[in-house]
Amino acid sequence: MVILMIKIGFVSTIDSDDLVFEEAYKEIKKYGIEFKILDYKCSRKEFEEFLEFIKEANIVFTKLMGGKNAFKYYDELAEFCKRHNIPFLPLPTISEIHPDLEKDRTVDDDVKNKVVKYLGYEGVYNYKNLLLYLANRFGNLNVEYEEPRPMPWQGIYYKGKYFETLDDYLNYLKELGRDLDKPIIGVLFYRNWFVANNIDYVNDLIDIIENKGAIPIAVFSSHLKNELGSIGTLETFKRFFYKDGKPIVHALINTTMFTLSMGVKAELLKDEPEFLKELNVPILQGIISTGFIEDWKKSVSGLNPIDLIIGMAMPEFDGAIIHFPIGGKEKIKDGEVGVPIIKYRAIRDRAEKIVDLALRYANLKLKSNKDKKIAIIFHNYPPRNDKIASAFGLDSPESVVNILKEMKKRGFIVDEIPKNGTELIKKMLNYATNDKRFLTEEMIKKAVGKVKKEDYEKWFNSLSEKVKQELIKNWGAIPGDVMNFDGELIIPGIINGNVFISVQPPRGFGENPSAIYHSPDLPPTHYYIAFYKWIKDVFKADAIMHIGKHGNLEWLPGKCVGLSNECYPDICMELPNIYPFIVNNPGEGTQAKRRSYATIISHLIPPMTISDLYGDLVELEKSIDDYYETENKEKKEFLKKEILKKIKELKLDEDLLDGKVIDEEINDENFEKLLNKIHDYLETLKNRQINDGLHIMGVPLEGDKLVNMLFMIIRYQFNYLEILAEILDYSWEELNENKGKYHKILDEINEIGLNLLKEYMQYNFDENKIDELKTVKINSKLRDVLKTVSTIYKNLMKVDEEIINAVNALEGFYIPPRVAGAPTKDINCLPTGRNFYSCNPQEIPTKSAYEMGKKLAEDLINKYLKEEGKYPEYIGVIVWGSPTMRTKGDDIGEILYLLGVKPVWNKMGRVVGLEVIPLEELGRPRIDVTLRISGLFRDTFPNVVELIDEAIKMVANLDEPDEMNYVKKHYREEVEEKIKKGIDEKTAKETSLYRIFSDKPGCYGAGVSHLIDEKNWESIEDFAKVYVEWGGYAYGKGYYGVEAKEEFINRLSKIELTVKNEDSQEWDIFEGDDFNSYHGGLIASVTYYSGKKPVSYVGDTSNPNDIRTKHLKEEGKEIFRTKIMNPKWIEGMKRHGYKGAADFSKYVDHMFAWDATSGIIDDWMYEKIAEKYVFDKDMEEFFKENNPYALLNITERLLEAIERGMWKADEEMKEKLRKKYLEIEGMIEEKL
């Protein structure tokens, strides 16, 4: 027998095929066939070895999911085959169409069609005959082969058996004596793994489900319908998860990747996946990692970037509850086909845990509501009595009252419904709380729970040795000192029927303040662990509900994503986690989803309105109007003096950062300039978006609040005001260029806009009544906007679904998904009450985001150039995850454009590369940018981190003059300097390009807020040292979390300009501590390490048609005037009793913090705070009645500002504040 040498090459993205081809090749290699597979993730060396192999190949074919872009060497491969006359058949996976592959095909249609069938049907039989067919067709082999044969496309798998119908399977289980009345858990896995017999992990899941007393239905399928026999997701669900037209499963563990909806027609999906709503069971995402289990175990990041996208981000589009890897790859052997042979194996403890959780979700569906126990957890940061129920934009106590009402209505045992949210908190304050200053013996005595040492010891002993050692090292012997009274750990909160309402334990930095300086990865306390174990094992909760943005559980140390049993969020979270969360914060909501397995229930933002002017600001505007309108010279001169006097009294000249107005320096010309600036500024202050109180879950807006909210949503997003101006024959561009001059016209347009909406409201926003509206002439553009208003209104009226779905989740229902976003920028996030998702990281930045980023960069550079007379060489930028998700990458676009680089997108809108913008096109130097990214951004956008790092390296290595490329200039200087110091060239080059810094892997935050909250600082040196300790880790392509504190200090010492952008006015920089902790911390660090305070900007894109780059201090003054001192804002907050007072306290905390780091609060501002919030009689009564702890904290903060020299108050003020503090403290203690 003559042995022929036939060579066949194959490039694949589907590694489960490798095992099948290995088995197939064993049977046919005797015919002299050489067959090699090249994995799409191959190295350059491996690719070149493959080219050497295929030089004399008879044919090369591919199976590339995603087309040519999936394989980085594709073009080289196609060119190589063409050059060497090798028949080339590039194919995607079945059901994909990629014309870019088709154009490179050099074999006939009949060959392609047959190969597609062999590859589509899969299995050893088909792959063996595929290779024989190709060897016969292209290698002159004369051996019989079989035609492609269909293999099962979908079905039920059970312990080596395959069932075509649900009835066949259930009948088989009955024959085995199984009790079908038990909970039924669905498992979904890929058909190709079934055909490849690569299902060890599925066998394990089946065993675990049965061992825990439930019935498994393990279904294999392909997401996409095809002509070869796949019926697709929708029909698969109907065939195997329904019986007699009703769902038979109680929970579903999905182990497939991407999105279940990808194979379902758009009309069946509508806005939300209707087929999943009909199934109506929780979908638990059990991730089967594309990486090796051993790598995951060792990894601090957890999952690899591919798993993050296809195993987490995309399933979130389905409303899946994201969990952890329950399986991954294990290498079986080195294959004869050129690649290692792998199998997917279970990670046993993770598989056990996901089944436990699936059973707990099934239990929510099966158990009677009257028998369920629910824990409701308020956040409490800082852990003080004025800040119980801290949640952004939400009246969380009132919302919980509404949740309790709905629970009682549905049969949950709730003994009493509090009169309102304030009464609920007052009741909680009668029991133990986290604020140890006010814990009395009586409170400790009547605590709802006490954990003895021996009880905690059982929980403690269930932890791994590593975790036990960490806890003991940081918190001492069990059960620790935190919340330990007479040897027992006290559980705060109240029990109301079958509902436990409590406060989340503190993170731990208050209990160990020195750890802020050296241990950002400080583990939670023994008490923290005990609290969550007590809820599960003693209170025996069926589910937990965390209320509002955001707690600390999801930020505890551990792997970044894809947690193990040694990660602290995983240790604590063993129950279904329902999490109402503000709709405009996708990033931190995503953190809760991925690190505490939360089902998000999105809630609306607070009611929004325009700020308006008040008090002396109104009078000043009138005086300016009078000045412009009068012809009388004497009156003009009088008004001029009055205007100057009022400007100085109100300190408005300081707001504009032009220095104080000095009468002697004022002449007619500069007075007119000043007047124009002040007039424009008043218009800005008048029209800033502010919240009118807080949102209450489930409560629809009505009347003026509804009209104002609709107005704020449409005014910029749909160019509402511009359309009205056009109808009224005004030039919108001219009006905006001279806002002060034309403010009366702008006011008129605003008023008409509001009146039109009020009139429309009389018709319940019925779009069929648009032509009956009389307020203004309706043109086609306005008609379209009003039709959109009708849709927005309907979605706002679905706000009751926030409460409905929160309680639905407690009944084990499916919560449908919807994209997160800021409603005033993107109405697609409405309605709320949804399990929101964020974005596809591969699309960041989108084309529109890059264009917005360009505008931001140009505005920033132009402002700096105008003010400083030069280009900034070094810029420090703060980059967060949530803004990136909301804007789809504005900040990333800005950074790339500062560097002089633009992304390359493929046809699907995914970023696939970078392109340098030539200097002649750029028209300016390339700016050197240092990023401080949040831990959340690091975790959610690893691909973007690598993209920016790649851009930096590209720019640093360009052949351009130093004066036109600051990155290259600084890189060259640093490398030379390091080599002189004896550092080797490789290290010098690598470290001199570190530009992206973040937290230590598995850690989060900037540390500065903890220092301020614990009063654990003396000067900006402390902030700088903590900022570097927490953020001194470098990230980029090829390195992850490298400790680089000296490099970070080096960058900080050279930064001239800092910036953090804000894309909406639904929040502001005084609303949360992270704004200051990151940006303020950066400013303090630059000031300390450089010896000079940097210029600091805020890029405001809240109105995308009018981007404004402002000085940080300007932004602070705007917020101070439009919110903190604005009666309209104050009265709105006061309506919310305890929570409104808590938020007043929060704002003063954060103003103080900004002043500590960045010096942006002037003495007069502190004085105004004292006058309004401490000494105003009405406010004092409000605080005393609703939340005296808030008044105590505000007074304490003001005294601290004086003591630290931040506020140069006189002795009289100091004494008044001291007296007030002692008075309030005495009042509180008297009531305890």
UniProtKB/Swiss-Prot annotation:
Protein name per the record = Uncharacterized protein MJ0908
GO terms in the biological process aspect are: chlorophyll biosynthetic process; cobalamin biosynthetic process
Q: What are the GO MF terms of this UniProt record?
A: cobaltochelatase activity; magnesium chelatase activity
Please report which protein family the annotation says this sequence is part of: Belongs to the Mg-chelatase subunit H family.
The set of disulfide-linked cysteines is: none
Q: Which Pfam families match?
A: CobN-Mg_chel
This protein's species is Methanocaldococcus jannaschii (strain ATCC 43067 / DSM 2661 / JAL-1 / JCM 10045 / NBRC 100440)
Q: What is the lineage of its organism?
A: Archaea, Methanobacteriati, Methanobacteriota, Methanomada group, Methanococci
Q: Where are the transmembrane segments?
A: none
